[in-house]
Design a protein with these regions (language model features):
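Secreted/periplasmic carbohydrate-active enzymes, especially glycoside hydrolases
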Residues: 1-184, 191, 195-196, 230, ...
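Substrate-binding/catalytic cleft of secreted carbohydrate-active enzymes
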Residues: 121, 166-169, 176-385
Length: 414
């Protein structure tokens, strides 16, 4: 976290110490040190005069003891998509004799995500409202939805493939990814932390067949624990990643009370990030919808719908076929106000698979029944702005142009 001036940082640490021995564990302590990583590098140096030690209470055999500590850091280098400065936190568990019995580490970053009311005189557009901030500044999340998919390996993406994806995104001015619709491989978060991509991490909940009707699994109490468990598994696994700036409760899984329980459980663990759940805006911190028309988006900018929170379009500009031609119309509206903090195109990469022509043996990107499979999704899996093998489509270059961070306008040209 950062202080109110976004200058000094504090790191709230919670650690579980488990006694796997048959004897009572006494006199143990945890010591924490911090190392500053070079920008875009895994090389780091120790941060001097930043050290905290906390005693571990007696731990009985087979039991877990939770310890908490706060590490204060003067003027840390802040993490953002533009300057993703990271730190490595090292924890050492020492016994009563001072001997190190276990060491672990994790990547962290100092940044502050806020949703706050803003008076007109403090807004660059002169409009009062409730806006989304990172490190004290409004941001535009220029995003895509991403499935883990590659025609060579299916869903088992390699590290080289993920690295190529990140580089392609950065070159296209993409600064945001919605992990749709499940938490991703740990290495994906590592790369987004390192190179700077704002993530919306999404719980693996999508009872799409029942959608928002009375039969939705979000209603029956029998499914409450499952909803809460999937959300909390995501949070506990990924909470340390500075790249995660939004939590999502799931996708297209209904409006019921089970998501209220999941939201409440999440907030017990992490209040530092806002929570979104597409369309079901009454129970979360920020608004969202899917595939709004350009007319609706322009109307929202004008205040036609009396929406009280910052808005993030979780899916828009469905990139099937010859699509994305009107992307600039969305962004002219989005960039005219801080009411919209951005959105995520559906989607990043085609979900195709390699197949081979029976006559020529030539390999091609197959989909929608090309394997003789029935039923199939037709071309509905081919919505990316890049092909399955990560070759950019024309849409990629359209996105790069519209998502550019600098606008240029001719003035008095002769």
């Amino acid at each position: 976290d950062l202080d109110v001036t976004y200058t000094d940082g504090s790191l709230a640490i919670s650690a579980d110490v488990c006694n796997l021995d048959k004897k009572v564990a006494k006199g143990y302590k945890l010591e924490y040190t911090l190392y500053a990583n070079e920008l875009y590098s895994d090389e780091n140096v120790k941060v001097e005069n930043v050290l905290v030690s906390t005693a571990v209470d007696v731990v009985n055999p087979g039991q877990i003891q939770t310890t908490k500590a706060v590490l204060n850091v003067k003027a840390p280098r802040k993490w953002s998509a533009e300057f993703p400065y990271r730190y490595t936190l090292v924890a050492e568990l020492k016994n009563a004799k001072g001997k190190v019995v276990e060491t672990t580490s994790t990547i962290v970053g100092f940044r502050k995500v806020e949703i706050k009311d803003t008076p007109a005189e403090e807004d660059e557009f002169g409009l009062a409202g409730c806006y989304y901030y990172i490190n004290g500044k409004t941001v535009k999340l220029k995003g895509v939805n991403r499935h883990e998919s590659n025609p060579a390996v299916g869903h088992a993406i390699t590290r080289d493939m993920m690295e190529k994806e990140v580089m392609l995104m950065k070159r296209a001015n993409i600064n945001h990814v919605r992990n749709s619709h499940y938490p991703d491989d740990p290495y994906w978060y590592f790369l987004c932390n390192k190179y700077g991509l704002y993530l919306e991490d999404e719980a693996n909940i999508e009872s799409h067949e029942y959608y928002y009707g009375a039969a939705s699994l979000s209603h029956p109490v029998e499914w409450k624990k499952a909803h809460v468990a999937r959300v909390m598994e995501m949070v506990h696994a990924n909470i340390n990643n500075p790249s995660i700036v939004i939590w999502s409760l799931g996708n297209e899984a209904g409006p019921g009370e089970n998501f209220v329980a999941a939201y409440d459980a999440l907030k017990q663990v992490d209040k530092s990030r806002p929570v979104q759940y597409e369309r079901n805006n009454d129970i979360v911190d920020m608004g969202s919808n899917q595939y709004p028309s350009i007319g609706w988006t322009r109307g929202a900018v004008k205040g036609d719908y009396d929406i009280k929170y910052p808005f993030h379009i979780s899916e828009y500009a469905h990139s099937m076929g010859n699509a994305c031609g009107n992307l600039v119309d969305y962004w002219e509206a989005i960039e005219s106000t801080n009411f919209f903090c951005g959105g995520a195109i559906w989607d990043w990469v085609d979900q195709s698979m390699y197949n081979y022509d029976k006559k020529t043996g030539k390999r091609y990107l197959a989909y929608g029944g090309d394997f003789g499979d029935t039923p199939n999704d037709g071309q509905f899996v081919m919505n990316g702005i890049v092909f399955g093998d990560l070759e950019p489509k024309p849409q990629y270059y359209e996105v790069k142009k519209v998502y550019q961070h600098i606008g240029v306008k001719a003035v008095d040209v002769r």
